[in-house]
């Protein structure tokens, strides 16, 4: 997960300041992996709960810098997602919720073309959860 997070940071054109750090927590009912990276314009955090079926992942890309959310979605393909939900929060408007979206495809690993056509902001702060 450290390599994946480092690659994501490179692909969305952010500057890594520290990390990524990765830790597995083995607590029944809440076991999973947490990854945190400090970037020049804020942070990236990921939590993966492996007890759920299917596994659940939450990824926060929080930045005051511009980036293209579709690049994050493309990188998430590495995990073979079958469902993706996202929230766009605008820091300029005191974190007003500006956009909510969802992509779901029962055929695992296909249908990303429809996601590319979704109404996405050109620059965003992304909370995938």
List each model region and its residues.
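Polybasic/polar functional segments that serve as interface/processing modules
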Residues: 1-129
């Amino acid at each position: 997960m450290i390599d994946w997070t480092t690659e994501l940071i490179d692909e969305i054109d952010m500057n890594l300041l520290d990390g990524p750090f990765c830790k597995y927590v083995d607590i029944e009912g809440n076991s999973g992996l947490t990854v945190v990276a400090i970037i020049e314009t804020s942070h990236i955090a990921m939590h993966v709960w492996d007890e759920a079926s299917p596994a659940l992942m939450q990824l926060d890309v929080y930045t005051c810098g511009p980036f293209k959310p579709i690049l994050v979605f493309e990188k998430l393909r590495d995990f073979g997602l079958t469902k993706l939900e996202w929230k766009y929060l605008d820091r300029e408007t005191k974190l007003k919720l500006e956009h909510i979206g969802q992509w779901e495809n029962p055929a695992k690993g296909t249908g990303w073309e429809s996601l590319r056509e979704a109404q996405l902001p050109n620059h965003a702060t992304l909370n995938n959860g």
